[in-house]
């Protein structure tokens, strides 16, 4: 035990001193904070007027999050207006890195869903705080904010604390998502110009496997022609639903081989998946969505999905867990507390479960962004990672998609073998497996599921820092 604790301490020291060289919706549907508890929640803070009028210091000062018992990291939060016509606003919460914040890369985190709040990533996965059942705030052992400046945005409009006053303010495709995010990012870096010079990475998991390539491609396209440039260096995608057609085509075999379907159930699953793919090829997007929803997701159906009926499980994020862990929803009650809402400047705004967001993105659900991802892989650093125990976007399904990708390194990728990754040379346990081709890194993390940093916090922490700080995948020596 003592030796293990020393390894953790050494890893943190290494990070400071080594130079750099919706669809998946069930977990979010249980997280609904319709109204705050009674009390003074203050008023929502809209920062775009301060940005437009050049009142940057005042905007920064007003957006600073007030101290709350257990929450002592310096942070900023508020709303950025991305469409004045429809009064569409994206909520953000920004944490400068604990170490060397002036130079640390800025990392945007986007949750999946569609319609999952990035507050889930903050409180459940890799932010500085954990919420207990009695609303106590604890410090996370391996927060990504230790070495990275983390920007959490509730995306798209209508997700979490983000909102719009008009139905036309909702995104109906990834172009809409990217356009709103780009507006928010440009305004964010104008509000915090001291961070605009830092390297910028876009990260996310699950359905954000669409959001991340979409906004990255948008930045890639606009940077050459815009005066204000975002210093995009790379992206990281966890268990990413980037390429639905290819992923859906592998479900029946995968679920059968891990023992979740019998032979008859596999035949039904395969038949329905083929029907879904047929609709995708015919661009019958709504029909494809309905087939997949009845088969697997059960988000908008009257009863359980076929998957839920035959497995008895509602959780397809970890093969070892039939239901979602209870502690993954504690933060929702915390965000109802008026003193918390006042501290993060959201006032009495509803915290949405994202059902409306998914409704407007139903056709987008089965569309691919693979061409955008391939373009990003040609020019930027890219990390694609999977938890070994994930079901909904299993490692085998990600690899199935990657084998069909057309990018500059595709020939080399298909002929490159994965290598063993350990954090420390003396570790008995293997952290995972890595396949690297140039600036592209594919990682499978052992012992983790879809919500990877929750299942494997240290391995996720080590992985993201190795990738962003270009430290390679050789084990550290004690």
Swiss-Prot record:
Annotated PROSITE patterns: CARBOXYPEPT_SER_SER (PS00131)
Active-site feature positions: 206, 390, 450
Keywords, comma-separated and alphabetical: Carboxypeptidase, Glycoprotein, Hydrolase, Protease, Signal, Zymogen
Enzyme class: hydrolase
EC nos: 3.4.16.-
Residues bearing glycans: 83, 134, 309, 350
Keyword match Signal: yes
GO biological process terms on file: proteolysis
Matching InterPro entries: AB_hydrolase_fold, Peptidase_S10, Ser_caboxypep_ser_AS
Leader sequence segment: 1-22
GO molecular function: serine-type carboxypeptidase activity
Hydrolase recorded as keyword: yes
Pfam families recorded: Peptidase_S10
Record family assignment: Belongs to the peptidase S10 family.
Task of the protein: May be involved in the digestion of phagocytosed particles in the lysosome, participation in an inflammatory protease cascade, and trimming of peptides for antigen presentation.
Annotated protein name in UniProt: Probable serine carboxypeptidase CPVL
Gene: CPVL
């Amino acid at each position: 035990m003592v030796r293990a604790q020393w390894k953790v301490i050494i890893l943190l020291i290494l990070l400071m001193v080594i130079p750099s060289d919706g669809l998946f919706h069930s977990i979010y549907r249980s997280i609904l904070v319709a109204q705050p508890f009674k009390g003074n929640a203050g008023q929502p803070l809209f920062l775009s007027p301060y940005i437009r009028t050049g009142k940057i210091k005042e905007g920064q000062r007003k957006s600073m999050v007030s101290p709350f018992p257990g929450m002592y990291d310096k942070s900023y939060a508020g709303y950025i207006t991305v469409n004045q016509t429809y009064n569409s606003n994206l909520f953000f919460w920004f944490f400068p890195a604990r170490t060397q914040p002036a130079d640390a890369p800025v990392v945007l985190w986007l949750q999946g869903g569609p319609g999952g709040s990035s507050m889930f990533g903050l409180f459940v996965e890799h932010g500085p705080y954990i919420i207990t059942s009695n609303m106590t705030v604890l410090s996370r052992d391996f927060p990504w904010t230790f070495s990275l400046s983390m920007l959490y945005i509730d995306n798209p409009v209508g997700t979490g604390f983000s909102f719009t006053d008009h139905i036309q303010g909702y995104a109906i495709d990834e172009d809409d998502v990217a356009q709103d995010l780009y507006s928010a990012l440009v305004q964010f870096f104008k509000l915090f110009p001291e961070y605009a010079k830092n390297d910028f990475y876009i990260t996310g998991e699950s359905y954000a496997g669409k959001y991340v390539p979409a906004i990255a491609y948008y930045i890639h396209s606009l940077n050459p022609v815009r005066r204000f440039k975002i210093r995009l260096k790379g992206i990281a995608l966890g268990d990413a639903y980037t390429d639905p057609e290819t992923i859906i085509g592998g479900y029946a075999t995968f679920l059968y081989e891990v023992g979740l379907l019998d032979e008859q159930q596999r035949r039904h699953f395969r038949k329905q998946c083929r029907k879904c793919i047929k609709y995708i090829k015919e661009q019958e997007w709504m029909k494809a969505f309905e087939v997949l929803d009845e088969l697997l997701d059960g988000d908008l159906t009257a009863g359980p999905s076929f998957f839920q009926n035959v497995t008895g499980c509602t959780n397809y994020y970890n093969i070892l867990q039939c239901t979602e862990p209870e502690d993954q929803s504690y933060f929702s009650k915390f965000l109802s507390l008026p003193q918390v809402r006042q501290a993060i400047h959201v006032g009495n705004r509803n915290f949405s479960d994202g059902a409306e967001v998914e409704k407007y993105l139903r056709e987008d659900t089965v569309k691919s962004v693979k061409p955008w991802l391939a373009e990003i892989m040609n020019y930027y650093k890219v990390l694609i990672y999977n938890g070994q125990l994930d079901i909904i976007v299993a490692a085998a399904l990600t690899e199935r998609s990657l084998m069909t990708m057309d990018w500059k390194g595709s020939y080399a990728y298909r002929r490159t073998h994965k290598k063993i990754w350990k954090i420390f040379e003396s570790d008995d346990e293997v952290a995972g497996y890595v396949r690297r081709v140039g600036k592209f890194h594919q990682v499978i993390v052992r012992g983790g599921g879809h919500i990877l940093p929750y299942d494997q916090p240290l391995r996720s922490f080590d992985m993201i820092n190795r990738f962003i700080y270009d430290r390679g995948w050789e084990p550290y020596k004690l």
